[in-house]
Design a protein with these regions (language model features):
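Short secondary-structure boundary/capping segments
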Residues: 46, 51-65, 161
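N-terminal leader/propeptide and maturation segments of large enzyme subunits in energy/redox metabolism
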Residues: 1-2, 54
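Beta-rich accessory regions
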Residues: 27, 31, 56-60, 153
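Substrate-binding rim/cap in mid-to-C-terminal beta-strand-loop elements of soluble/periplasmic
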Residues: 3, 25, 64-169
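The substrate-binding groove and active-site-proximal loops of carbohydrate-active enzymes
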Residues: 3-15
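Metal-dependent active-site segment of extracytoplasmic phospho-/sulfohydrolases and closely related
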Residues: 15-53, 77-80, 96-99
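An alpha-helix initiation/capping motif
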Residues: 14, 35, 39-42, 140, ...
Length: 169
């Protein structure tokens, strides 16, 4: 059961990678890849919300009136894990492995929960392509940075709504 949960997650990652590849290939085909800012990030580290044994239906973990999933339910629906019939989540042991070398995971303000990847590709401004950086970044810095790169002022109004001041730089 545990392996099937990770197999489903790995399938999701593989599918996501293929779709990102399709976008990159298309941008290359139309000769716009080097004129495009590509930003890829995660909102948090791996999640332990699957608990000790994983969940076939993660929504049930929020339902205090129904019994939680157990291994028997997951085993009974083994072939459905990863399909449109499940809203599954892998066990927390996989979350630990997903965050290596960082301890803990999403929900905790500890390395495994808050140190997540950010990849930005824009050859016009990033000269040392492929460099791995260790300094912290915060999502509030992305929009101001992109506006600066594109030499665009932050609009004061959007569709008649006054925009708040940006806190990033």
């Amino acid at each position: 059961v545990y392996a099937r949960y990770m197999e489903a997650f790995a399938g999701f990652l593989d599918y996501t990678d293929e779709q990102i590849g399709r976008v990159i290939d298309y941008l290359e085909e139309i000769r716009e890849l080097d004129n495009t800012i590509v930003v890829f990030l995660s909102d948090n580290g791996a999640s332990a919300e699957g608990g000790q044994d994983g969940h076939f239906n993660t929504c049930k973990s929020f339902d205090i009136f129904s019994p939680s999933d157990d291994l028997e339910v997951s085993l009974e629906h083994l072939e459905d894990i990863g399909s449109e019939y499940a809203f599954n989540h892998y066990p927390l042991g996989w979350a630990n492995l997903g965050n290596v070398p960082f301890p803990w995971y999403k929900t905790w303000a500890y390395s495994g929960g808050v140190k997540d990847p950010l990849i930005i590709r824009y050859p016009k401004a990033i000269k040392d392509a492929g460099t791995i950086r260790s300094q912290y970044e915060h999502v509030i810095d992305i929009t101001p940075t992109i506006l600066d790169l594109l030499e665009i002022e932050k609009p004061a109004h959007i569709k008649g709504v006054i925009q708040k001041e940006m806190h990033g730089k």
